[in-house]
């Protein structure tokens, strides 16, 4: 699991965070200053990258939050059998199996053996983002 920690105040919409062990994309962030002696708070709304679940989190802006390190690479589709897509990593030619549920909707109709796809590796899981 490759992650790093950043301050909540540095997050923006479109950033990625780890909430409850699930990598999520931030879709909304609200920062509010509380009273005279209180610290500012941030309310984060994020959507899970693998399960699509909506998660809400409220933290002080100076708190540390876990951010996944996303590794992007190109792979070639070797075969599609049922709900499993077998890929070959074009960097080191190792074989990877990705479930069909981890494929972006706009890429699903264009998958074919021999075509190249962009793959994101997030927290030791793989997601097919687009067909090249």
From Swiss-Prot:
InterPro entries: IF5A-like, IF5A-like_N, NA-bd_OB-fold, Rib_uL2_dom2, Trans_elong_IF5A_hypusine_site, Transl_elong_IF5A_arc, Transl_elong_IF5A_C, Translation_prot_SH3-like_sf
Subcellular localization: Cytoplasm
SUPFAM superfamilies: Nucleic acid-binding proteins, Translation proteins SH3-like domain
Segments traversing the membrane: none
Pfam families membership: eIF-5a (PF01287), IF5A-like_N (PF21485)
Entry keywords, A to Z: Cytoplasm, Hypusine, Initiation factor, Protein biosynthesis
Major site of localization recorded for this protein: cytoplasm
Residue numbers carrying Hypusine: 36
CC terms in the record's Gene Ontology section: cytoplasm
A GO MF label: ribosome binding
BP GO terms, sorted: positive regulation of translational elongation; positive regulation of translational termination
Signal peptide: none
Disulfide pairings: none
Family (UniProt): Belongs to the eIF-5A family.
Function: Functions by promoting the formation of the first peptide bond.
Protein name: Translation initiation factor 5A
Phylogenetic classification of the source organism: Archaea, Thermoproteota, Thermoprotei, Thermoproteales, Thermoproteaceae
């Amino acid at each position: 699991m490759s992650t790093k920690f950043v301050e909540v105040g540095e997050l923006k919409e479109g950033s990625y965070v780890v909430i409850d062990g699930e990598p999520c994309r931030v879709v909304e962030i609200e920062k509010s200053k509380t009273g005279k002696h209180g610290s500012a708070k941030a309310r984060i709304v994020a959507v899970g990258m693998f399960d699509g679940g909506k998660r809400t989190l409220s933290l002080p802006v100076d708190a540390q939050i876990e951010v996944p390190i996303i590794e992007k690479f190109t792979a070639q589709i070797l075969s599609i059998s049922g709900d499993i897509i077998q890929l070959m990593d074009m960097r080191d030619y190792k074989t990877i199996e990705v479930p069909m549920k981890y494929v972006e909707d706009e890429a699903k109709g264009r998958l074919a053996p021999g075509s190249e796809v962009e793959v994101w590796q997030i927290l030791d899981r793989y997601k097919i983002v687009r067909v090249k």
